[in-house]
Regions:
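Juxtamembrane/disordered regions of integral membrane proteins
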Residues: 1-138
Length: 138
């Protein structure tokens, strides 16, 4: 068993976070906001009193992503897998753990299927990038 590659954890989290900025910005930002009832005026106005400030939302999102990446890094350190297995583990986290958990919540909240696919695909693509970082940093 080796040590967790903390550089890969930080850079992998950063890669996932940047993908999220692109994903929920130019790629799918407009339909995502519409399905969540967020108007352009609301975005421009910023958080209302009683809502979390934007900096806190971003920080917590980054830390939650880092927690997932740290767990993946721990699994990689414990098993010392081949590169293709690292990618299978990373994509598996997104497709088989995070996506079903998200799906359960979306079903009970009666959220649109299109919104589910946008969010679930973000997890899968983001974690594939994380897997790539772990492979690159060996």
């Amino acid at each position: 068993m080796g040590d967790v590659n903390l550089l890969a954890v930080v850079l992998g989290t950063l890669a996932w976070f940047v993908i999220g900025a692109i994903w929920y910005g130019p790629l799918f930002g407009k339909p995502w906001r519409e399905m969540n009832g967020i108007t352009d005026e609301m975005v421009k106005a910023g958080p209302r009193p009683g809502q979390n400030p934007t900096w806190l939302i971003m920080l917590l999102a980054f830390l939650f992503e880092m927690l997932v990446v740290l767990m993946l890094g721990h699994n990689i350190a414990r098993t010392n897998p081949a590169p293709h297995v690292i990618m299978m583990m990373a994509v598996g986290f997104g497709a088989v753990i995070m996506t079903p958990a998200l799906g359960i919540n979306y079903l009970f909240q009666m959220r649109p299927g299109k919104l589910f696919f946008i969010d679930a695909a973000h997890f899968i693509v983001g974690l594939a990038a994380v897997g790539g970082v772990f492979i690159a940093l060996g």
